[in-house]
Regions:
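Carbohydrate-binding surface patches
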Residues: 52-91, 100, 126
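Generic structural motif
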Residues: 56-58, 92-97, 119-122, 131
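Hydrophobic beta-strand segments of well-ordered beta-sheets in folded domains
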Residues: 3-5, 67-69, 95
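Flexible loop/turn segments at secondary-structure boundaries
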Residues: 12-16, 77-79, 104-106
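Aromatic/acidic polysaccharide-binding cleft in carbohydrate-active enzymes
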Residues: 1-58, 63-64
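Hydrophobic, well-ordered secondary-structure elements that form the walls
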Residues: 34, 69, 97, 126, ...
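C-terminal beta-strand-rich structural cap/linker in extracellular carbohydrate-active enzymes
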Residues: 110-132
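C-terminal accessory region downstream of the catalytic core in glycan-modifying enzymes
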Residues: 88-111
Length: 132
């Protein structure tokens, strides 16, 4: 169980700051991961998860009305391939996928409908998605 995320150095004029660009305060990629984690924590009630897909890590929470799933595909492989896996939701409805990668800054990427309480997700290496 992970109950805390610590970011070592978020001083705005520090070269170690991975949240904001030095001198301009423009958001860097690290900002969006920390923001998503904060949103997840604000929902309060964590959900049990299991995943047997290598290099895929996830966390989920709900407040009784809103559900959120955060999934990351992190790898150090020299030539990693995309990973495709099933996401079991338990209900049929539309889900919005927010993506953080080289081209996207945790913005809505696609809307997907679950079928029989599940859908298939493909992630590129070193990507984070939020599913709401």
């Amino acid at each position: 169980k992970t109950d805390m995320l610590m970011y070592y150095d978020a001083r705005v004029n520090s070269s170690m700051n991975g949240l904001f660009k030095r001198g301009t305060l423009d958001r860097l990629k690290g900002y969006y991961s920390v923001k998503a984690w904060g949103e997840l924590l604000s929902l309060r009630d964590e959900c049990a998860l299991s995943c047997d897909v290598p290099d895929i890590y996830s966390a989920a929470a709900t407040d009784g009305e809103t559900q959120m799933l955060l999934v990351t595909y992190y790898t150090d492989d020299a030539a990693p391939l995309p990973r495709t896996f099933k996401v079991e939701t338990g209900e049929d409805r539309l889900y919005t996928i927010y993506t953080l990668d080289e081209e996207h800054d945790m913005e809505p990427f696609e809307t997907i409908a679950s079928n029989n309480g599940e859908f298939t997700l493909t992630m590129r290496p070193n990507t984070v998605v939020v599913i709401k």
